[in-house]
Amino acid sequence: MTRCIVLGRFQPFHLGHARLVEAAVNHADGDEVVVAIGSAQAGWEANNPWTAEERQAMVEAWANSTGNNVTVVLIDDINDPPNWVEHAATTHGDGRLVTSDGPTAELYRAAGWEVHDVALSERETLEGWRVRQSVRMLSTVMDDEAARTVLAASVPEAVIEWLIQNDAMFRCSTFESGVHAG
């Protein structure tokens, strides 16, 4: 049994994230899986449309729908990579990082952590900025079935339902800044 940590912004929680968390659940083999939501102070902006609490609700909606038991924690970003791991670990605690992000893996390894690398899944489709642009495109389409159909390729059903039920897509139509890939 290995306590596992999955770290991300989850803007929004998409199918790539779901596969990563599922890999952590399998790797943990019954131990705790912590989903650590970074940039917790961010929200209501083009590259971070949803607040930490909203992202937590998305993760929990997905986890409840799949029967995956996870603990969600929120971590403010300090924009200081050399000190990030120590800062984040005070919130997410000890364990093994499960990630598909090379730079994050390097930071954690340099700090002495064990890291379980997971291959990226459908990166061309499942990049956060691409998913956010799909949500933005749908944000003024007042047709829930159209939103479900389009987002199903990249977002778990429970998260789509959360976005619809909480009217959490429309805000994306109001952001002025351009696309940020990353």
Where are each of the predicted segments found?
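Nucleotidyltransferase catalytic core that binds NTPs
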Residues: 1-182
